[in-house]
Amino acid sequence: MAKSTPLRREHGQTMVEFALTLPVLLMLVLGIAQLGVAFNHYIQLTDATRAGARFGAPLDCSGTCDRTDKVVSKVRASAANLDSAQVNVSVTSTWQPGTDLRVCASYPYAINLIGLVVSSGSLNSCTTERVD
């Protein structure tokens, strides 16, 4: 009769440990990836508000054009990778030279892990420029 060695008794231990830790590691990696996507959306939203403020500050709209609508359109166009229907833009200004133009935008986000919403809310960004 062959004597059993300690290595033979622990043959499947590594596989069991791997099977137990793999789901936790996968959720951690997927969570980091989802956080990266949310951060990317925030950067795009910030760049879009900055582009809208820089577009609207020197905008000379003598006559019939609506500056607010033009700035809102510029912000939505600048947020190319975001769903423009969900980008909520507000523009605040008196449009007098030397006053501030404030462009704010918000965009909803949700961090999902395996179909479960872990965190949700809205990303917000505001940019202020001086009207020329």
Language-model segments: residues:
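Short amphipathic secondary-structure patches
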Residues: 47, 51-106
